[in-house]
Design a protein with these regions (language model features):
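The Walker A/P-loop phosphate-binding site
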Residues: 2-109, 121-127
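Residue-level preference for the first positions of well-ordered beta-strands
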Residues: 57-59, 85, 141-143, 189-191
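Short acidic/His/Gly/Ser-rich catalytic and metal-binding motifs that mark active-site loops
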Residues: 97-98, 151-158, 200-202
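Phosphate-binding/switch loop-helix module in NTP-utilizing enzymes
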Residues: 116-187
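Long, well-ordered amphipathic alpha-helical subdomains in the mid-to-C-terminal portions
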Residues: 284-314
Length: 343
């Protein structure tokens, strides 16, 4: 068999700019090099790994009030907590600095960009990636968030120039072809949000499916796509709810699922799980963690009581205290999230 390294050597001698390597040895990665938690165990569990991937794109889709921006801030705060660099492109001009600080974001070390157009957004992301990787170490975590891709108009729109049908999708598709490879080689987590769009469903019965700007282009480039939908509100006073339940649906993922060659039963699409979202603080970590532990049978439930191993049973409202008493609960949760959906 011919030596593939000899082919690489000849390419280098010819001054080729083509990124190429043999197998896993090189800058091109087939799998993420790490993960940044969303601080919502339910979402991490849906992803199948302990957070959004470093070296890939994550897409969060949801209407106004579905918690996308809060989850973005959680990811940025988590990246900073691990010593990484956080960057946010605020295309809608709705970044709330007080809320970001409340959720743990270090504003003194947060890079904020506010592009005027969609073209500026993508050009800025590419420039930030190159600048950040040059300024930071090779192993430093970098998380870039675009909130949202639907918030920035195209340059022609700002000048009231008539555009071709689907011009935004064409631009997004072209830019994502470049960005998906760039974030992969630079080990960067790129998180993008988008909003659902109405589509006329002529000649069909029932509720039309959910669609969003850049659906095909971003969906193809993303390692993980999650749809967030607001459900029933909760609170002691129905007239003044303090939060609502969020239904999270895993539309697609390329980083989790069954790896058994002969298995034909496991699915990695359309997983749906619900978590509590408080308007003041975002996803409730403790109830979300308990739900994941219960689903994986690490914690048993009977008659309103939860039980972990041989410890004394407890109520759901006592779980936050029990995590302090039983540190192994967090270790168990961490093992579940590292292992994905399957035992």
């Amino acid at each position: 068999m011919a030596d593939p390294k000899e082919v690489i050597k000849r390419l280098q001698q010819a001054d080729s700019n083509l990124p190429v390597q043999v197998g896993r040895e090189g800058a091109i990665i087939g799998e993420p090099t790490g993960y940044i938690s969303t601080r919502c165990p339910t979402i991490d569990y849906l992803i199948g790994r302990p957070g959004v991937p470093l070296g890939g794109i994550t897409l969060l889709v949801g209407a106004y009030g579905s918690g996308k921006s809060t989850i973005i801030l959680n990811v940025l705060a988590e990246a900073q907590a691990s010593g990484g660099q956080a960057v946010i492109f605020d295309t809608e001009g709705r970044l709330n600095f007080d809320r970001a600080q409340k959720l743990g974001v270090d504003l003194d070390n947060l890079i904020v960009a506010q592009p005027d157009t969609l073209e500026d957004t993508f050009d800025g992301v590419k420039a930030i990636i190159n600048a950040a990787r040059e300024a930071l170490g090779e192993d430093d975590h970098i998380v870039i968030a675009i909130d949202s891709v639907a918030g920035a108009p195209m340059e022609k729109e700002t000048k009231a120039v008539k555009m071709a049908l689907g011009a935004q999708s064409v631009l997004i598709r072209r830019e994502l072809r470049v960005l998906s490879n760039l974030v992969n080689r630079q080990r960067i987590a790129l998180v993008i949000t988008s909003q659902p769009r109405q589509r006329i469903n002529l000649g069909a019965w029932g509720k039309p499916g959910t669609h969003w700007l850049g659906e095909d282009a971003i969906g193809h480039a993303a390692m993980t796509t999650i749809l967030l939908e607001e459900q029933k509100q909760f609170g002691d006073d129905a007239a003044s709810p303090i939060g609502h339940h969020i239904m999270a649906t895993l539309i697609d993922t390329r980083i989790a699922g069954c790896t058994e060659p002969t298995c034909k039963e496991c699915r990695r699409k359309d997983f749906r799980r619900t978590f509590d979202f408080y308007d003041a603080t975002g996803p409730d970590f403790f109830s979300s963690a308990l739900d994941v532990l219960q689903e994986k049978k690490a914690v048993t439930y009977k008659g309103g009581w939860y039980k972990f191993k041989e410890h004394k049973p407890f109520r759901r409202s006592d779980f936050e205290q029990k995590i302090t008493e039983y540190p192994e609960l967090l270790d168990t949760l961490r093992n579940i999230l590292n292992g994905g959906h399957y035992d």
